[in-house]
Curated annotation (Swiss-Prot):
Disulfide bridge positions per record: C4-C49
Keyword Transmembrane assigned: no
Name of the featured protein: Trypsin/subtilisin inhibitor
Keywords from the UniProt entry: Disulfide bond, Protease inhibitor, Serine protease inhibitor
SUPFAM superfamilies linked to this entry: CI-2 family of serine protease inhibitors
UniProt record similarity statement: Belongs to the protease inhibitor I13 (potato type I serine protease inhibitor) family.
PANTHER family in UniProt: PROTEIN, PUTATIVE, EXPRESSED-RELATED, SERINE PROTEASE INHIBITOR, POTATO INHIBITOR I-TYPE FAMILY PROTEIN-RELATED
BP GO annotations: response to wounding
Site (Reactive bond) location in chain: K45, D46
Amino acid sequence: ARECPGKQEWPELVGEYGYKAAAIIERENPNVRSIVKHERSGFTKDFRCDRVWVVVDSTGVVVRTPRVT
């Protein structure tokens, strides 16, 4: 398993607005940068302890559990 510091996932943010969720994530784990992306966007496959994808639909609402990826 990969060991990264701080909170790793935020299931409670599904249904929240993406940019609000991103701010909450960065406040709860200052080691990460949260990046809001549309669910149909391309995503890199590399793993990074300092990145969280915040995946939103066309209305800007989080549709997948944000987690360190």
